[in-house]
Amino acid sequence: LKPYGRYFTPDPASLKSAMVGGIVMNNASGMCCGTHANSYRVLKSVRIILPDGTILDTGDKESRAQFLMTHPKFVRKIDDLRIKTQRNAVLCERIRRKYSIKNVTGLTILPFVEYNDPFDIIAHLMVGSEGTLAFLSSITVTTSEIQPYTASALLLFPTTKSACEAIIEMKQTGLLSAAEFFDRKAIRTVEKDFPELQGLPDDAGAVLIRTDAVTEKELLEKNKTLQKLLSYYS
């Protein structure tokens, strides 16, 4: 994708050895994509093989029509679950909140809240299913534009609270590509290599941030805005 100026947003630590199918079926994400650009968010359609040998391509009209003829009860049950879920406003809100943070526990139920088309629901149920629902043979996803200019910084804060507050403020600007928090114990593991970290308060925190931009000018403007925001914490 790089020659086309695009990239696949999920970026798990195992990216160099991972395959797209494995990333999707495990809902592997990484530091940068969070929940806004993980496998669930970039998925458009899937081609799957069900336990009975049926092949379904959710992005193909003929395949969908054929599946409706051969598996009407299956589709109807999916739609019944959707209707039952969406009628419960309290449950819907709880599901949205649970999946607004990284959540790979069990099978995802978010599609029943976010989609009305049963085939979109089926496709997104595959994310994180680890092969328990069907074999994933093909997937169509969206990609994002590569932003070639990047800046990163390790920020030190006197308290965990101030570090977390700074992350929230920086996130609200929409300028961050990634932010990772380190507590005092994590900082101690690298003190030997970075003596300047020694002597920090016991409640100190650190935040590793990254911001990306299409042009150098845009990157400088982003950095200037972030520096102004962070001056409050200095």
What are these regions (language model features)?
Residues 58, 139, 164, 171-234:
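Terminal amphipathic helices with adjacent charged low-complexity linkers/tails
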Residues 2-167:
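FAD-binding subdomain of flavoenzyme oxidoreductases
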